[in-house]
């Protein structure tokens, strides 16, 4: 019954228009378009919310990014890893690298956005929640339609998932190298350990490759990985890692 009412076409007949005069009749097609747009928009939003709610409990089996990557690279075996089985230092490292204020905001880091706008920088200010929305529900690449959908998905995820669930899903679908998706595959392929056994140095190096997983090597130390290790220690001290 709910689904039937959800997808029932909107009533677009407006008999009162004919009595209102020719002006009202002239605007009738536009009003019908607006009614249909509102009907479609509300149904699309409802379906997005349902999908987000499902993935609050069910682990995403795959993503568009993984499917696309499988056409050019063999995909390493990807076993889902619960957040409790990921080393705390790995959780802190990825937050320090990608979204230091992850525990403090509701999907959009407005202070970081203001910094980017003020500096005129071309670098992004996407939070881990925004990246999770893109990686799980959408596609890669820059486009206004994708960014719009990401902006809708982000508050839905924040409302329906816990912070730990967001980070768990993010770490299980993120790409760490060509064909290497998820922290379980990354820890095994690069270091021969489980995610729970990752050291601070290994965690920092894995987090360092996330912006460019196809071109960066997690077996090599870098200034970025050292900065991430320092950042992970900092957010552990100042309380910004309390939600992890």
Identify what each model region corresponds to.
Residues 2-244:
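Juxtamembrane regions of bacterial inner-membrane/periplasmic proteins
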């Amino acid at each position: 019954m709910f689904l039937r009412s959800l997808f029932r076409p909107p009533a677009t007949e407006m008999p009162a228009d004919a009595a209102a005069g020719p002006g009202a009749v002239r605007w009738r097609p536009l009003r019908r378009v607006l009614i249909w747009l509102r009907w479609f928009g509300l149904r699309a939003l409802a379906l997005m919310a349902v999908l987000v709610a499902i993935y609050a409990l069910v682990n995403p089996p795959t993503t568009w990014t993984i499917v696309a990557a499988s056409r050019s690279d063999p995909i390493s075996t990807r076993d889902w890893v619960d957040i409790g089985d990921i080393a705390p230092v790995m959780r802190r490292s990825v937050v320090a690298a990608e979204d230091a204020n992850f525990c403090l905001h509701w999907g959009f880091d407005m202070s970081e956005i203001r910094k980017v706008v003020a500096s005129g920088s071309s670098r992004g200010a996407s939070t881990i929640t925004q990246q999770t929305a893109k990686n799980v529900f959408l596609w890669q690449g820059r486009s206004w339609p994708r960014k719009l959908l990401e902006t809708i998905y982000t508050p839905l995820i924040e409302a329906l998932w816990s912070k730990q669930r967001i980070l768990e899903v993010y770490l299980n679908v993120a790409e760490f190298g060509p064909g290497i998706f998820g922290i379980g595959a990354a820890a095994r392929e690069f270091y021969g350990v489980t995610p729970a056994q990752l050291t601070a140095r290994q965690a920092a190096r894995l987090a360092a490759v996330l912006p460019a997983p196809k071109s960066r090597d997690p077996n090599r130390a870098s200034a970025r990985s050292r900065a991430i290790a320092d950042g992970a220690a900092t957010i552990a001290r100042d309380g910004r890692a309390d939600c992890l």
